[in-house]
């Protein structure tokens, strides 16, 4: 990766920036103070090896913080900075959203005071993991110490412990909020904190976790090694995307998806289990129903043994209209190219959502949020990397779902809130439902809700209002109205 600066253990200088601001929420002016800084991690020899960069928002008119929650938030990847959740819905400034399927990736972009900001009820800490955003891997020889499921989680815990001591927040309620792979990070970090790390224990506990675009499963690594057909787990999302574009029914998306799931849980999964032993009558029934619910053609289903491949689905559902749908948001489309040029599976994702929004987020974050935070850092800001290509996926203690179960059983008051988009083809909500059915989680403390969105639930003014309201209620101890 090319950079315009080079860091070495003997020359790295930690950065720290402070600012003050005010925001009006529900008619009340709220003052806040921000501290953006490097959180340096040192090796056994005392030399700095890496830094996790944090952007902290403190409400400055609160004197006693013992009962004031702190929300620690990040994106996923692995290899993504916190830019998306920061500029998307958690900062005091955020993007102003327009239509979902915007035609151009170019400006003008609008950034506004965030009317839904959680600063009214909680302090907020946004986190750039090592090697992302302004986070830095200082010693390049130490990649294996940070770029892996457990390594990443322990680096986070190391920094959070130090941050909590530094700002005297040991008594404050603490919440994790992760998006996408950030859900994996949250579950593993909470599990390790409740039990034991590779070499040490941690003195931090979490009151709750918000999972946005869930990646916590009973499999080895998201969808790997799951004892169920992925076509069945993805089926409810396929139905949601088909409902949005092809309008097969007058039902609401919730009712249509619920009906599709009931079919997938019984007739469809049984047909896939039978395989070639299925009768012609049964096969016709399955072909008709699967095509109706998902929008995929009979011809495709016959060629693929009634199964649906995730990559193929994005090309198939609107094939007759000459369009492909986005992996990150099935509502967003682009022209369908020739098959030999289209997608080039596993090598190129020409994703319509990323095409439209990545530049928007970067412009908003670097052009507005950073100046407002008084961050003046002559360092490459890395929105995202390909660390996931080289990530250590080994989990010595079990699956991500097991880590979450460890945390919730050892911390009896801990709660979990899963938020998923009906049109998210990246982390399909069927996986979250499967996790909640098979992970042994305490059901009275686990909540799920679907949103009229894709992977990034906060895209769209209605969605960002709803999501922030639900998270606010969750932090205040109210149980979200679970749709699961």
Language-model regions, residue ranges each:
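Short alpha-helix in the alpha/beta-hydrolase fold that links the catalytic acid
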Residues: 414, 428-438
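A catalytic-pocket lid/entrance helix-loop region that shapes and gates access to the active site
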Residues: 94-96, 190, 194-293
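Catalytic histidine-centered segment of alpha/beta-hydrolase-like enzymes
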Residues: 454-464
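Alpha/beta-hydrolase fold nucleophile elbow
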Residues: 169-181
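Catalytic histidine neighborhood in serine/cysteine hydrolases
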Residues: 440-456
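Alpha/beta-hydrolase fold catalytic core
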Residues: 275-426
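N-terminal cap/lid subdomain of alpha/beta-hydrolase-fold enzymes
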Residues: 2-4, 46-145
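Alpha/beta-hydrolase active-site loop
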Residues: 119-120, 129, 146-166
């Amino acid at each position: 990766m090319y950079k315009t600066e080079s860091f070495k253990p003997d020359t790295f200088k930690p950065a720290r920036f402070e600012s003050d601001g005010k925001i009006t929420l529900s008619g009340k002016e709220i003052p806040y103070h921000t501290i953006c800084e490097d959180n340096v991690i040192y090796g056994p020899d005392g030399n700095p090896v890496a830094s996790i960069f944090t952007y902290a928002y403190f409400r400055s008119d609160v004197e006693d913080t013992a009962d004031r929650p702190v929300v620690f938030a990040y994106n996923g990847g692995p290899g993504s900075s916190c830019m998306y959740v920061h500029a998307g819905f958690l900062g005091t400034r955020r993007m102003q959203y327009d239509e979902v399927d915007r035609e151009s990736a170019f400006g003008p972009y609008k950034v506004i005071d965030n009317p839904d900001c959680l600063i009214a009820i909680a302090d907020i800490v946004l986190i750039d993991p090592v090697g992302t955003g302004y986070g830095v891997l200082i010693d390049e020889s130490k990649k294996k110490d940070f770029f892996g499921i457990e390594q990443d989680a322990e680096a986070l815990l190391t920094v959070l412990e130090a941050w909590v001591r530094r700002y005297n927040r040991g008594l404050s309620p603490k919440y994790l909020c992760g998006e996408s792979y950030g859900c994996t990070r949250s579950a593993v970090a909470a599990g390790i904190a409740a039990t034991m790390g590779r070499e040490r224990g941690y003195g931090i506990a979490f009151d709750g976790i918000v999972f946005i675009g869930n990646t916590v499963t009973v499999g080895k690594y998201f969808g790997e090694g799951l004892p169920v057909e992925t076509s069945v787990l993805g089926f409810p999302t396929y139905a949601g995307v088909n409902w949005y574009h092809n309008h097969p029914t007058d039902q609401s998306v919730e009712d249509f998806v619920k009906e599709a799931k009931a079919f997938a849980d019984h007739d469809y999964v049984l047909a896939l289990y039978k395989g070639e032993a299925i009768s012609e009558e049964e096969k016709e029934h399955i072909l008709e129903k699967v095509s109706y619910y998902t929008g995929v053609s009979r011809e495709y289903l016959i060629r693929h043994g009634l199964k649906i491949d995730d990559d193929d689905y994005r090309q198939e559902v609107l094939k007759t209209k000459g369009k492909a749908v986005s992996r990150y948001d099935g509502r967003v489309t682009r022209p369908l190219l020739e098959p030999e040029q289209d997608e080039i599976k596993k090598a190129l994702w020409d994703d319509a959502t990323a095409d439209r929004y990545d530049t928007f987020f970067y412009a908003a974050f670097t052009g507005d949020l950073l100046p407002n935070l008084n961050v003046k850092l002559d360092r490459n800001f890395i929105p995202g990397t390909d660390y996931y290509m080289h990530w250590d996926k080994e989990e010595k203690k079990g699956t991500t779902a097991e880590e979450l179960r460890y945390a919730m059983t050892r911390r009896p008051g801990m709660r979990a809130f899963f938020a998923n988009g009906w049109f998210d083809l990246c982390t399909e909500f069927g996986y979250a439902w499967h996790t909640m059915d098979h992970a042994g989680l305490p059901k009275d403390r686990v909540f799920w809700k679907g949103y009229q969105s894709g992977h990034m639930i906060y895209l769209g003014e209605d969605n960002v209002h709803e999501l922030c309201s639900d998270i606010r209620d969750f932090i205040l101890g109210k149980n979200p109205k679970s749709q699961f």
